[in-house]
């Protein structure tokens, strides 16, 4: 086990349970993990303010990290590992390094740098910086590493008779995502397909902010959206009963979303707006349809043809264990 006996101080925001998946995966290969939320709280107000202007909570964030530093002061770590680093300041990273000089500091960005105003402030303080976004890696000299799927997705069965939905979308509402998904849904319904869409906002502050900025969303009733994340159990059930998954990435983002990699893991077909997916080794036009963001079109042939298996060595290279081995090499 490549992390046998290694001590890791791990920071990640609560994000649909992925922080637990990563912690459990590290422990499964021998690591001893101390986990802390990267944000000082997870209520909608704190999440919303951090996204809009984290400096408004600087005192609160500093107090939170002071407490963590005191709690971990007497411990020795091999690694201090951050996911994204949305709320922590450069000053607090420096202080962690001061008290844990023996540790390797690693950060992984699973969002575009353009979507995280705090990201570039932190880069100089980490020994290794990874990103899922190829363009960010080329521009800033970061290590490129796509996201991962967990065993939960790899273990989803596929039985034709149990497929209920031809198209499934579950995701956060941003940019033009709602409008695009609905345009794709309309086409599939016209072809006789059954669709399920589920749109999420992390907080009502972000919902009202986006509603002010987006004239299209102002026409959509508030009850259309969800303000609590879908449980992982329900999401896995929906994947098991779906033929095609929809992905609409943020316009400022070139990296493949978690949804893309999970769809690979679940062996489902994918419709995406991210044309960069054609550069990845698992791309197969029989399984993955890239649509124009301005004029999405779904051929009936793609809807009806079966999924084609990905070569085993390529498929397994996107597992969470392989992702960890790339980070902690």
Residue ranges and their predicted role:
Residues 57-76:
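An amphipathic, basic-hydrophobic alpha-helix
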Residues 2-59, 84-91, 117-257, 269-278, ...:
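Nucleotide-sugar donor-binding catalytic core of glycosyltransferases
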Residues 93-100, 185:
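Surface-exposed amphipathic alpha-helices with a cationic face
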Residues 68-73, 156-158, 298-304:
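Short amphipathic alpha-helix with an adjacent loop that forms part of the alpha/beta core around
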Residues 97-112, 130:
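Active-site proximal beta-strand in glycosyltransferases
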Residues 81:
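N-terminal Rossmann-like NAD(P) cofactor-binding module of classical short-chain dehydrogenase/reductase
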Residues 265, 269-329:
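Pol beta-like nucleotidyltransferase catalytic core
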């Amino acid at each position: 086990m490549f992390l046998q006996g290694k001590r890791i101080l791990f920071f990640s925001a609560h994000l649909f349970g992925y922080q637990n998946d990563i912690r459990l995966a590290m422990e499964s290969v021998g690591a001893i993990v101390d986990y802390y939320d990267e944000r000082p709280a997870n209520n909608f107000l704190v999440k919303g303010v951090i996204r809009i202007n984290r400096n408004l909570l600087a005192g609160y964030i500093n107090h939170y990290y002071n407490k963590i530093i005191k709690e971990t002061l007497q411990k020795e770590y091999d690694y201090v590992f951050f996911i994204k680093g949305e709320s922590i300041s450069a000053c607090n990273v420096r202080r962690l390094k001061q008290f844990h000089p023996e540790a390797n500091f690693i950060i992984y960005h699973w969002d575009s740098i353009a979507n995280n105003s705090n990201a570039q402030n932190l880069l100089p303080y980490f020994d290794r910086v990874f990103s899922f976004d190829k363009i960010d890696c080329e521009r800033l000299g970061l290590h490129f590493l796509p996201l991962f799927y967990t065993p939960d997705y790899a273990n989803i069965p596929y039985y034709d008779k149990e497929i209920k939905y031809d198209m499934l979308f579950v995701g956060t509402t941003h940019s033009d995502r709602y409008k695009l998904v609905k345009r794709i849904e309309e086409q599939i319904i016209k072809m006789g397909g059954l669709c399920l869409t589920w749109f999420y906002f992390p907080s009502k502050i972000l919902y009202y902010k986006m509603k002010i900025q987006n004239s299209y969303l102002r026409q959509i009733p508030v009850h259309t959206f969800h303000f609590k994340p879908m449980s992982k159990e329900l999401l896995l059930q929906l994947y098991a009963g779906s033929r095609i998954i929809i992905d609409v990435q943020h316009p400022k983002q070139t990296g493949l979303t978690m949804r893309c990699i999970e769809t690979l893991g679940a062996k489902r077909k994918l419709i995406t707006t991210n044309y960069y997916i054609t550069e990845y080794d698992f791309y197969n036009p029989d399984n993955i349809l890239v649509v124009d963001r301005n004029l999405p079109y779904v051929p009936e042939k793609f809807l009806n043809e079966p999924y084609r298996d990905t070569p085993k060595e390529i498929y397994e290279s996107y597992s969470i264990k392989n992702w960890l081995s790339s980070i902690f090499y």
